């Protein structure tokens, strides 16, 4: 998979049997630091593309990690499909496809970092796939409650026939019928369904909440941690943060630092974040962010020409 002579971010395409494709970006560990034991897979939050996590990938690679990101099918980003057809099950299948692809390429030690809505997907699959550890940030545990807060109305109480055509979720039109139908059919919507999915979790797990998060109740995340009944789990709070971890540079840097510390700790089988990290220069983080936006635009233009 790796190509040391490749561009700063290595672009991969997973081609599916139905003609669709999932775009994957690979970031190699920096050459001047010891390479860590695990590959980090980042699952972006809803309405976030993989290039939105350029800074986190830079932090992780600066500290010796091999980093993989992807855009889900039927989501914002470079993979196939439109966001008005997105469902939680499509997000789940996209994640599973990328994990299988990594396994096929000889990557066996995977640590998963999942944010926001993708964390709910991670909780669903964590006991069904081979992971070494899990890190979630502002992870959704009660989907129905989070949707009600984000949309300012509990649309899941309505009959399918009475739903509006689209739900405006963070400026994107989410197809209401297909999304809500999938939620009920596959039991994505309740806290209890999340608790059932993580029951008996054996791998190390660190969860980050944000103390100003109005979309996810910290009490419910604590309930999730307690339900696992394992000493291999730990909860931390990102002080001063809301659900939007990129709302300002101070919050964003704290997120990068905290998650990188968690990854380093878990790479060594620890849960304590009293650990030193190598901080990339601000100019390097800015540069890689700009370069990846350009790469995204170039790929989008190529896709338009092929359409």
Swiss-Prot record:
Q: Which UniProt keywords apply?
A: Acyltransferase, Luminescence, Transferase
Q: What class of enzyme is it?
A: transferase
Taxonomically, the superkingdom here is Bacteria
Asked if Nucleotide-binding is a keyword of the record, the answer is no
Q: Where is the active site?
A: 116, 213, 243
Which GO MF terms are attached to this record?
A: acyltransferase activity, transferring groups other than amino-acyl groups
A Pfam family of this chain = Acyl_transf_2
Q: Which GO terms describe its biological process?
A: bioluminescence; fatty acid metabolic process
Q: Does the keyword GTP-binding apply?
A: no
Question: What EC number is given for this enzyme?
Answer: 2.3.1.-
Q: Which InterPro entries match?
A: AB_hydrolase_fold (IPR029058), LuxD (IPR003157)
- Of which family is this protein a member? Belongs to the LuxD family.
Record's function text: Acyl transferase is part of the fatty acid reductase system required for aldehyde biosynthesis; it produces fatty acids for the luminescent reaction.
Record protein name field? Acyl transferase
What does the record give as the organism's lineage?
Bacteria, Pseudomonadati, Pseudomonadota, Gammaproteobacteria, Vibrionales
Gene encoding the protein: luxD
């Amino acid at each position: 998979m790796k190509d040391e002579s490749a561009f700063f971010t290595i672009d991969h395409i997973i081609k599916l049997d139905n003609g669709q494709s999932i775009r994957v970006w690979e970031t190699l560990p920096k050459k001047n630091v010891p390479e860590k034991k695990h590959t980090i897979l980042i699952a972006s939050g809803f309405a976030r593309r993989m290039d939105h996590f350029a800074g986190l990938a830079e932090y992780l690679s600066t500290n010796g990690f091999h980093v993989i990101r992807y855009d889900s099918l039927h989501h914002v980003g470079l993979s196939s499909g439109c966001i008005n057809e997105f469902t939680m099950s499509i997000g789940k299948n996209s994640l599973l496809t990328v994990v299988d692809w990594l396994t096929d390429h000889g990557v066996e030690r995977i640590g998963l970092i999942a944010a926001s809505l993708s964390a709910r997907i991670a909780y669903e699959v964590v006991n069904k796939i081979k992971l070494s550890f899990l890190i979630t940030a502002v992870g959704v545990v009660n989907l129905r409650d989070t949707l009600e807060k984000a949309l300012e109305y509990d649309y899941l109480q309505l009959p399918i026939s009475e739903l509006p055509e689209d739900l405006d979720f963070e400026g994107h039109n989410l197809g209401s019928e297909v999304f809500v139908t999938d939620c009920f059919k596959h039991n994505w919507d309740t806290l209890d369904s999340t608790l059932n999915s993580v029951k008996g979790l054996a791998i190390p797990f660190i969860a980050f909440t944000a103390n100003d998060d109005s979309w996810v109740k910290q009490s419910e995340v604590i309930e999730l941690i307690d339900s696992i009944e394992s000493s291999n789990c730990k909860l931390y709070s990102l002080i001063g943060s809301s659900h939007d971890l990129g709302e300002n540079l101070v919050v964003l840097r704290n997120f990068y630092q905290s998650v990188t510390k968690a990854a380093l700790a878990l790479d060594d089988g620890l849960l304590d974040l009293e650990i030193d990290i190598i901080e990339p220069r601000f100019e390097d983080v800015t540069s890689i962010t700009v370069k990846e936006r350009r790469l995204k635009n170039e790929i989008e233009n190529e896709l338009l020409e092929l359409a």
